[in-house]
């Protein structure tokens, strides 16, 4: 099946994270501060720490998060942060209590965020001649996928072309090479 791939080395890539580290951040929020701004700042800061080599842009949250905390109540809101030009969705879970008339929140990515440059790096570990093979896992640097989805990389070496299929295992971006 894999004409120029080393089957011996394929087992080394079976559960490797290629995602930007998923954001699982927490924050506390007092009743008289702007929750929307707090969350947007936290999203950008945490994303920059998780992926310092990627361009992280502006974060946006719904206007509803600008309401007084007491009127928001507990619940989940969808925010987004731009990474390499791609709008990456995040779920913000609000929990009331914990602070005087305030609350707390957690932020987690809603989809696996795959860095295709890292995926190319993993694919290069299973080809026999990584220096001469041309590997492409798509034009976009960042790809959003749900767990269970597949990502394909094309490997070209001389006249031979092969497709590698990776299965995304979870929101952390763990992938396995489908054989």
Regions found by a protein language model. Give the residues of each.
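Bacterial N-terminal signal peptides that target proteins for export
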Residues: 2-14
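Bacterial N-terminal signal peptides
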Residues: 13-22
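Sec/Tat signal peptide C-region and signal peptidase I cleavage site
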Residues: 24-30
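Short, non-transmembrane alpha-helical segments in secretory-pathway proteins
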Residues: 31-61, 111-138
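Serine/threonine-rich, repeat-prone extracellular segments and beta-strand-based repeat modules
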Residues: 56-78, 134-152
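Acidic (E/D-rich), amphipathic helical modules within compact regulatory domains
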Residues: 59-110
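A short, surface-exposed interaction/processing loop segment used at functional sites
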Residues: 99-116, 173-179
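Extracellularly exposed regions in secreted/surface proteins, prominently low-complexity, repeat-rich
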Residues: 146-179
């Amino acid at each position: 099946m894999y004409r120029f791939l080393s089957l011996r080395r394929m087992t080394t890539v079976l559960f490797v994270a290629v995602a930007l580290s998923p954001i699982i951040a927490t924050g506390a929020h007092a009743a008289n501060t702007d929750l929307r701004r707090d969350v947007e700042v936290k999203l950008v800061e945490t994303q920059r720490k998780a992926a310092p080599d990627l361009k992280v842009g502006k974060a946006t949250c719904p206007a509803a998060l600008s309401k007084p905390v007491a009127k928001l109540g507990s619940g989940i809101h969808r925010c987004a942060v731009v990474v390499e030009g791609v709008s990456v969705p995040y779920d913000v879970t609000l929990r009331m209590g914990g602070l005087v008339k305030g609350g707390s929140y957690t932020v987690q990515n809603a989809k696996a965020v795959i860095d295709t440059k890292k995926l190319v790096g993993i694919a290069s570990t299973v080809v026999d001649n990584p220096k001469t093979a041309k590997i492409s896992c798509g034009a976009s640097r960042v790809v959003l996928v749900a767990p269970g989805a597949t990502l394909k990389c094309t490997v070209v070496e001389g006249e031979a072309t092969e497709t590698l299929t990776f299965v995304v295992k979870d929101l952390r971006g763990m992938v396995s090479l489908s054989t």
